Amino acid sequence: MARYTGPRSRISRRFGEPVMGDSKALQKKNYAPGMHGRNKKRKQSEYSIQLKEKQKAKYTYGVLERQFAKTFDTAARKQGITGENLLKMLEARLDNTVYRLGIASSRRAARQLVIHKHIVVNGDVVNIPSYQLKPGDQLGVREKSKSIEAITDSLSTQSAKKFTWLEWDQSSMLGKFVTYPQREEIPENIQEQLIVELYSK
């Protein structure tokens, strides 16, 4: 499965919520896309409900199938609750944290900033979006990238978004991944237990 690059509104309408960021389309057309979207009321099987939840998580965090399965496998081998481990690992991705800090306006934009080497971790450029941050890691905008309009615009409009597991210093454009978030701190509407049940089949 290739990375989805189509309209975000179409994905939001499929799940009935702004999975890939704010979507004005949901306000006008809060039903599934397609010719029969408005009248789609078939009873869903347990499997389809579980699969849909996994797809929602993949679209939310911008992760492809193979990488998602690998992340789940790692989460299952860790101590603790598998579903919560999965979400914590998705939250600890570099691209997601760049988005959470407000450096980028969306996870898709954050991914591009990472790929194009605008982000540093502990002083070194890291261009791997899936890079797993560890508690104590410092990350921020590369010195020569601090004047990029997309970054400054995003920081000016999203700086109010604060997450307890992150720290951010606006003047230096440097942040810190303090710790892994607790489940109740993660705002995404994902029922991770359904994903665990799907992989347990």
Swiss-Prot record:
Keyword tRNA-binding: no
Any one GO MF annotation of this record: rRNA binding
SMART domains for the chain: Ribosomal_S4, S4
GO cellular component: small ribosomal subunit
Disordered: annotated segments: 1-46
Keywords from the UniProt entry: Ribonucleoprotein, Ribosomal protein, RNA-binding, rRNA-binding
Keyword Lipid biosynthesis applies: no
TM spans (from-to): none
Subunit organization: Part of the 30S ribosomal subunit. Contacts protein S5. The interaction surface between S4 and S5 is involved in control of translational fidelity.
Family: Belongs to the universal ribosomal protein uS4 family.
The protein, known as: Small ribosomal subunit protein uS4
Source organism phylogeny: Bacteria, Pseudomonadati, Bacteroidota, Cytophagia, Cytophagales
